[in-house]
Design a protein with these regions (language model features):
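Membrane-embedded alpha-helical bundles of multi-pass transporters/translocases
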Residues: 2-242
Length: 242
């Protein structure tokens, strides 16, 4: 009489929910990316229709390019590459309280650095513009306009960096929708500023600078409810070790 062998593990049954979750996450991310691309295209069309190509628009593009460039270096560059693996390790090996403490300390340190950087950029705005746009040197009015807008747009770096930190936390917990949808808020804010605010301003292009500022606040605020549901809403604490 043959003795039945051990029952093989049911790997496919266990893998199925994981695979379904991965497909769902991919679909959500792809959909939000598509929406972001479409709203970005609409934004560019609105820019062309409302402002056209002129020195004032060039001044705005420089004033926005500076914090956007630094965002790619910090929030989406080396900082994220360093933080996300550490957070993942904490999730696997530490309890929730220690994960929360890590998020609080990283947020506090990032906030302190960004506040100093923002203060320096706001105070030295004309010099910063000359470094990033040396072609403006012969046009004092354009430098001044770009500097005025940089003082409004540069805090976007602070808001979006904190939002990206929150997005990294959410992604590590497989909450992909909010970080993926966040760029849409920037496009919608810019479109609204161009269509609704610009006609009411003495210097219409300044509306775009305020649109950037508002977008940063919206993108940061958009992440907070999801972080709160994970009980990881940051309470910034500065610590030299992180």
């Amino acid at each position: 009489m043959t003795t039945p062998g051990p029952t093989p593990p049911r790997e496919p049954a266990k893998a199925a929910p994981r695979q379904a979750g991965l497909l769902r996450s991919t679909a959500v991310f792809s959909s939000m990316t598509f929406v972001s691309r479409i709203t970005g295209l609409v934004r560019d069309q609105v820019y062309a229709a409302v402002f056209g190509a002129n020195p004032a628009m060039d001044a705005f593009l420089v004033a926005f390019r500076i914090p956007n460039f630094l965002r790619r270096l910090s929030a989406e560059g080396s900082f994220s590459m360093a933080f996300v693996p550490v957070l993942s390790e904490y999730k696997e090996r530490r309890d929730h309280a220690e994960v929360k403490e890590l998020v609080d300390r990283v947020t506090g340190t990032l906030l302190a650095v960004l506040l100093v950087l923002t203060a320096v950029a706001v105070l030295a705005a004309p010099w910063v513009i000359r470094v990033f746009a040396p072609g403006f040197d012969g046009n004092a009015e354009q430098v001044e306009l770009a500097a005025q807008m940089l003082r409004i747009t540069f805090p976007y770096l602070l808001f979006i960096s904190l939002a990206s930190l929150g997005g990294g936390v959410l992604n590590s917990y497989r909450r992909f929708a909010v970080p993926a949808l966040s760029p849409v808020l920037l496009n919608v804010s810019m479109i609204t500023a161009a269509l609704a605010l610009a006609p009411r301003m003495q210097q219409p292009v300044m509306a775009l600078a305020w649109g950037v500022f508002a977008a940063g606040i919206l993108q940061l605020a958009f992440h907070l409810p999801s972080l709160a549901r994970l009980k990881l809403l940051p309470r910034p604490r500065w610590h030299g070790g992180h």
